[in-house]
């Protein structure tokens, strides 16, 4: 017997009962980004593998272990994008969007792919909303990105469940000096490091700071701190960011071990984390990458951005019971019609109502059925009200209006007054 077809492990279907919450989240973010002057860009989900090797770094876990890479019929090595920044930078360069030093504030949404071990809040296909800003190099734009997310958390009702962590990685020069000091310190404690950290010490020493191993964490307590190696420019930038966050009343903590998992970051890095989701606590993260555009073949261009994980934020909304009640309801009004003449009239009447109330979610019963069966479907739909049209109502040019979720008797409404009545009861609440 052949194996039944099913989704690939770690790549999940988003079912009809889940999509209203996704649409609510996505539209809430999109409105906020419009208000802040960000423009949407859409990139392919497949890029040349070399793009990610050059941007993310060949000795990162993502490139070494996690990318979905394949060879196409032309012999080109292609990769499903594991993150969005590199693809966005490629698009900006290819289409000359930052020519002449022109600032760009962009955002994107879509699936990303990493071959990780699936668990709650971590998937092999996951969705992100990302923001990228080019040709603005001051701490003010770093602050705007963080202020924007703080406002979003307020709109979503999750501010009390998230915490902002900050660090500065400095310039490549200061980071190089720090790397030398860190390697010297860790090498003196090599026997106390876990196996993965010993490997990282040789390939990407700063990533040792991100270890989850308790023994290695104990070694890191007395390790050199990046803050002691910052150049004046990076220190001034970081102080400017903190001053703006203080002025905006946004609480934060300095995490000297925050380094991020991608090689292109410099100066500011930040993460929004929560303790409500277990091990997968990072819901939004980003930072500055002033050298990335030049590294990818462009002219020197500053950049800063972040990405938020949609699955994790939706999981957080559900965990905190911050899902608006109306999100779970996909139908406002359910129209039941009995008899062929009534069915024809119901179709015409419903379209007239839609003309006048374009935001009304009106569903007509399909498949005929008895009064009992149609009314059962009306109740199961979650609609607030049922409309009832039979031969008697049709003869009088009225339609029955019955509340399904609260008190109230059924009443008859004239055809020409139906839209106004629904506007009062449903659209206006």
Swiss-Prot record:
Q: What is this protein called?
A: Histidine--tRNA ligase
Please describe the quaternary structure of this protein: Homodimer.
The listed locations are: Cytoplasm
For this protein, the record's InterPro entries field holds: aa-tRNA-synth_II, aa-tRNA-synth_II/BPL/LPL, Anticodon-bd, Anticodon-bd_dom_sf, His-tRNA-ligase, HisRS-like_core, HisRS/HisZ, HisRS_anticodon
| Molecular functions (GO terms) | ATP binding; histidine-tRNA ligase activity
Which residues does UniProt call coiled coil? none
Q: Which family does it belong to?
A: Belongs to the class-II aminoacyl-tRNA synthetase family.
Q: Which reaction does it catalyse?
A: tRNA(His) + L-histidine + ATP = L-histidyl-tRNA(His) + AMP + diphosphate + H(+)
């Amino acid at each position: 017997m052949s194996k039944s077809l099913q989704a690939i492990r770690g790549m999940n279907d988003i079912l009809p009962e889940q999509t209203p919450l996704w649409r609510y989240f996505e539209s809430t973010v999109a409105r906020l980004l419009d208000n802040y002057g960000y423009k949407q860009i859409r990139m392919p989900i497949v890029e040349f593998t070399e793009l990610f090797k050059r941007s993310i770094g060949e000795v990162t876990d993502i490139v070494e272990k996690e990318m979905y890479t394949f060879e196409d019929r032309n012999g080109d090595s292609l990769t499903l994008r594991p993150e969005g920044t590199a693809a966005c930078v490629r698009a900006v360069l290819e289409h000359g969007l930052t020519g002449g030093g022109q600032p760009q504030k962009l955002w994107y949404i879509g699936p990303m792919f990493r071959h990780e071990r699936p668990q709650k809040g971590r998937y092999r296909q996951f969705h992100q909303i990302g923001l990228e800003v080019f040709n603005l190099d001051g701490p003010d734009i770093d602050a705007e990105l963080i202020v924007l997310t703080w406002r979003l958390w307020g709109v979503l009702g999750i501010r009390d469940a998230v915490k902002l962590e900050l660090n500065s990685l400095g310039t490549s020069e200061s980071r190089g000096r720090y790397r030398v000091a860190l390697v010297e310190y860790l090498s003196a404690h090599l026997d106390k490091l876990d196996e993965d950290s010993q490997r990282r010490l040789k390939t990407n020493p700063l990533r040792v700071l991100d270890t989850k191993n308790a023994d290695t964490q104990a070694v890191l307590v007395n390790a050199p701190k990046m803050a002691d190696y910052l150049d004046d420019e990076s220190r001034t930038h970081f102080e400017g960011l903190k001053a703006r966050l203080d002025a905006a009343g946004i609480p934060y903590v300095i995490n000297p071990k925050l380094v991020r998992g991608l090689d292109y970051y410099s100066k500011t890095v930040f993460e929004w984390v929560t303790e409500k989701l277990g091990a997968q606590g990072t819901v939004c993260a980003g930072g500055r990458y002033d050298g990335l555009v030049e590294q990818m073949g462009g002219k020197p261009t500053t950049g800063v951005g972040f990405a938020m994980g949609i699955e994790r934020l939706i999981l957080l909304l559900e965990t905190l019971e911050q899902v608006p009640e109306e999100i779970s309801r996909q139908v406002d009004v359910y129209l039941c019609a009995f008899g062929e003449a009534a069915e024809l009239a119901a179709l015409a009447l419903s379209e007239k109502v839609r003309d006048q109330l374009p935001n009304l979610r009106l569903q007509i019963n399909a498949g005929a059925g008895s009064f009992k069966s149609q009314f059962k479907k009306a109740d199961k739909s979650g609609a607030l009200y049922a409309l009832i049209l039979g031969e008697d109502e049709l003869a009088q040019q009225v339609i029955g209006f019955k509340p399904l979720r609260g008190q109230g008797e059924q009443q008859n409404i004239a055809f020409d007054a139906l839209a106004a009545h629904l506007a009062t009861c449903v659209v206006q609440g």
